[in-house]
Amino acid sequence: EFLKHNKQILLSRHIQKETYDDLVQLVNTYSGELVNLLQSEQCINFNTIPAKLYDIYTPIIDIAGIGEKTDKFLLQLAVKDYLERQGYHTILVSSRDNSLYLDNVYSLPVFMNGGIPPEYKIILYNHFIKKMEEEEKPEVIIIGIPGEIMPISKVQPGHFGIHAFQILNAVNPDFLIMSLYGNEISGKYVKELKQIMKYKFVANIDCFYLGNYAQDVFTVNRSRPIEYFLINEKDKIQLRDNLKNELEYEEKIYIDTEIEMLG
């Protein structure tokens, strides 16, 4: 139906070859346009890559999440939008691999999910950010970290926080935002999380963000997918206030209506 009205079809996710072929045929039938936003695999000659990490002089803001569905991507866009409205030339390296259609937003590099040695992913990501710094000359770089920072449980390990380990070893952040689930959590949990980030990743959490989804804790120790439920604004504010009171206002904790107060 879109093609009949001269609309573009944007391909931003990997699909089966048969589905892709059908899509191409439809585009040709209606003289439409298929725009492939997916990054192609690159042939990398490791012998030409200096096995070193470069210093990054541009301020780096990292946005990580305790797990999936913590609104990391929306938070990345919101922080970018706020900084741009303040007049800063801001670039975002997204936690997603299909963000090429957004202004000044780079997708997660394809090599991060490729079959190359893990140590080279760290080196290549560092070189990727360095090249961006030199060519784009941004005033701020926002980096979104995909996935979780550690396994949710032994039954639901996710990707074991591999991307977090690789990216935080590739580039040291100047400011780190940790996105949490909208569950009732204790001050002890927050303090222990800060210790984990400090000693496992050599990174300090500067503030926390409460996402819009709560995790169904009864589903994290089963083999079926973890379930989540949306929480309303009133409950989110109450969670935030309860946690701040328990922590005696030592930590900065924000919700989506308070993005401009981050930091």
Task: Give the label of every model feature segment.
Residues 1, 10-11, 143, 178:
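Redox-cofactor binding/interface segments in oxidoreductases and associated redox assembly factors
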Residues 2, 6, 12, 20-23, ...:
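Conserved C-terminal guanine-recognition region of P-loop GTPase G domains, centered on the G4
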Residues 4-60:
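Extreme N-terminal, non-catalytic leader segments
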Residues 9, 88-91, 205:
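Hydrophobic anchor at the start of a short beta-strand
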Residues 10-14, 63-70, 115-118:
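Flexible, glycine/proline-enriched loop segments at strand-loop-helix junctions
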Residues 11-12, 176-181, 209-210:
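Conserved beta-strand segments of the P-loop GTPase G domain that flank and frequently precede/overlap
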Residues 45-93, 190:
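Walker A (P-loop) phosphate-binding motif
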Residues 82-163, 170, 175, 184-191, ...:
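ATP-dependent carboxylate-amine ligase catalytic core
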